Curated annotation (Swiss-Prot):
One Gene Ontology cellular component annotation held by this UniProt entry: extracellular region
Residues annotated with N6-methyllysine modification: 2
Localisation per UniProt entry: Secreted
PTM summary: Occurs in two forms. In form 1384.7 Da venom vasodilator peptide Lys-2 is methylated. In form 1370.6 Da venom vasodilator peptide Lys-2 is not methylated.
Organism: Bothrops moojeni
Signal peptide: none
Role, per record: Toxin. Induces vasodilation in mice and rabbits.
Molecular function GO terms recorded: toxin activity
Tissue distribution of the protein: Expressed by the venom gland.
Superkingdom, natural source: Eukaryota
Protein's name in the database: 1370.6 Da venom vasodilator peptide
Keywords per UniProt: Methylation, Secreted, Toxin
Length: 12
């Protein structure tokens, strides 16, 4: 399965 990146990205 294709994993979608988180958007907006969460800062560390």
């Amino acid at each position: 399965p294709k994993v979608s990146p988180r958007w907006p990205p969460i800062p560390p």
